[in-house]
Amino acid sequence: MTNLKKRERAKTNASLISMVQRFSDITIMFAGLWLVCEVSGLSFLYMHLLVALITLVVFQMLGGITDFYRSWRGVRAATEFALLLQNWTLSVIFSAGLVAFNNDFDTQLKIWLAWYALTSIGLVVCRSCIRIGAGWLRNHGYNKRMVAVAGDLAAGQMLMESFRNQPWLGFEVVGVYHDPKPGGVSNDWAGNLQQLVEDAKAGKIHNVYIAMQMCDGARVKKLVHQLADTTCSVLLIPDVFTFNILHSRLEEMNGVPVVPLYDTPLSGVNRLLKRAEDIVLATLILLLISPVLCCIALAVKLSSPGPVIFRQTRYGMDGKPIKVWKFRSMKVMENDKVVTQATQNDPRVTKVGNFLRRTSLDELPQFINVLTGGMSIVGPRPHAVAHNEQYRQLIEGYMLRHKVKPGITGWAQINGWRGETDTLEKMEKRVEFDLEYIREWSVWFDIKIVFLTVFKGFVNKAAY
């Protein structure tokens, strides 16, 4: 088969997958509502059909806005499913507002909730099957794309290796093209940049990933200009991986493309989702633990003289000072420029306080901090101001922890990095996990951390 025919077949297969996705989404939505009505003993009425159509239209509009029906090849399934459920949730919320005007509101609301839950499962399962099916086809030579890397950046090599290690993605690596250096060429070398242009013109390559240094701007511009005379897709790998980037993404500022190196993941819709998550969880948890809070408050009051609640100054989001609430666990309270970290068998800790610290129950009042907006359920744990000033000079990127709100529990704590940080290495590991959390943030990641906290995050021998 000629290269041109391979290219056309790849485009046809990609379009076919997109059509299958759209058709399956529509089918699952209507089938889900019909099934819920059947199980509930209700007729599938004209009103159900009308609202389902409106929901579908909204879902398709959101799909266009978020570019949902693009190719998800090479993108993690969790990312695709998160956007799928986000669009579906917003669509159902919109249609539920229409149902609110119905006379039999309670019954219709139950139907809508059941439809939402059933269809959510169906959409995710169907997308998983499509991914598996597409992967099988690509493993057998269908829907393949021939790709090449231009340049010798490490990021380009990493991308090439990932394509080779994941054949189900359907990317077949032609090789690496760059002008040879005095040290010779690697085994992956397929030719110089001029050879790349000739191969692209001959239809041997579908995608070209440019992985060249920032200082090679003139060469990059020349190569892009030459590739404009071909039909291959040209993608640029930004030379930003020399930096320890934090939640980078492509943005536009007054028509100028920019790539943030250090930024917060909590902007726009993500910020609203995170705040909604905090308010709902904190409210439910406070209602559930209110008897426990009263018992702990009484125990603290009887254990030693002093207030029940201790308010500590900590750095919040963007490094702004906040007051963090805790049950008092010590006979003395330190909140000065110099803070002595609690150690094992610390004489300042009361007997009740020792139990509270080991079980993290002393931190329960921080759910009030969450409601007031100073903290989050999940995030990097807040450190003493004195420790912040100390470690920001010793650990690169330490202050990047403050690109999100501090949390009651966090990814570092789940992985065992809590309690006394008596060595620099321990603090470095804690910061490493905190920054990993910020890079990988999602609502589902938060839920995972909350779930793990219930089983392994509260009691820890390192806490005293």
From Swiss-Prot:
It is found in: Cell inner membrane. It comes from the Bacteria. Belongs to the bacterial sugar transferase family. Keywords: Cell inner membrane, Cell membrane, Exopolysaccharide synthesis, Glycosyltransferase, Lipopolysaccharide biosynthesis, Membrane, Transferase, Transmembrane, Transmembrane helix. Its EC number is 2.7.8.31. The chain crosses the membrane at residues 16-36, 39-59, 81-101, 105-125, 279-299. Pathway: Exopolysaccharide biosynthesis; colanic acid biosynthesis. Residues 37-38, 102-104, 300-464 are periplasmic. Residues 1-15, 60-80, 126-278 are cytoplasmic. GO terms for molecular function: glycosyltransferase activity; undecaprenyl-phosphate glucose phosphotransferase activity. The keyword Cell inner membrane applies. Complements holdfast synthesis in the C.crescentus mutant lacking hfsE, pssY and pssZ genes. Can also partially complement the O-antigen defect in the S.typhimurium wbaP deletion strain. It is a multi-pass membrane protein. It comes from Escherichia coli (strain K12). Its main location: membrane. This is UDP-glucose:undecaprenyl-phosphate glucose-1-phosphate transferase. Is the initiating enzyme for colanic acid (CA) synthesis. Catalyzes the transfer of the glucose-1-phosphate moiety from UDP-Glc onto the carrier lipid undecaprenyl phosphate (C55-P), forming a phosphoanhydride bond yielding to glucosyl-pyrophosphoryl-undecaprenol (Glc-PP-C55). Also possesses a weak galactose-1-P transferase activity. Disruption phenotype: Cells lacking this gene show a non-mucoid phenotype. The gene is wcaJ. InterPro entries: Bact_transf, EPS_sugar_tfrase, Undecaprenyl-P_gluc_Ptfrase.
